[in-house]
């Protein structure tokens, strides 16, 4: 049986994550996913939006995932590899790990694990930052519309000072002279 290990934060689970994990599963018979602990996320990226228990449950609920575990809180990042003993570590196309460095360290530790970089996946909402950006953009537009709609009716209909936009129109659409 070929065991594949994938890893990530998986904060705001999205299609890019699903694609990564399903592609990783295709490399073997069993997929074990290491979900970054809250402490690791805080140290390396940002305050997590969803906590580790929720993230590991969401990832574990995916059909392609056989088991999801929470990674260690710090220390040796290779300890989990020694514990899980995967045949393959699948890296996402956008993960900032150097597969040659990982392979060299695994070899140095006597772990016969192969490291595979998965191919690029493109979708307009395939990343957490893209999703957050779209939400903020939509929220900004929504707030602008709300501000316009909250203006009193007189302010919406009243002509601007110094214009003749309140003058009656002739049948041809021009302004009638008074």
Predicted regions and their residues:
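Nucleotidyltransferase catalytic core that binds NTPs
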Residues: 1-178
């Amino acid at each position: 049986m070929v065991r594949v290990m994938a890893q990530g934060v998986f904060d705001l689970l999205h299609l890019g994550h699903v694609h990564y994990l399903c592609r990783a599963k295709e490399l073997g018979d069993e997929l074990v996913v290491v979900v970054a602990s809250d402490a690791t996320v805080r140290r390396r990226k940002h305050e997590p939006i969803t906590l580790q228990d929720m993230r590991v449950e969401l990832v574990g609920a995916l059909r392609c995932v056989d088991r999801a575990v929470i990674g260690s809180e710090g220390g040796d990042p290779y300890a989990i590899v020694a514990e899980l003993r995967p045949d393959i570590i699948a890296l996402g196309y956008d993960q900032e790990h150097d597969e040659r460095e990982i392979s060299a360290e695994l070899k140095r530790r006597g772990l016969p694990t192969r490291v595979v970089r998965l191919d690029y996946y493109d979708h307009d909402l395939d990343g957490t930052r893209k999703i957050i950006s779209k939400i903020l953009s939509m929220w900004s537009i929504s707030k602008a519309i709300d501000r316009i709609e909250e203006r009193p009716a007189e302010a919406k209909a009243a002509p601007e000072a110094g214009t003749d936009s309140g003058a009656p129109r002739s049948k041809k659409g021009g302004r009638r002279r008074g």
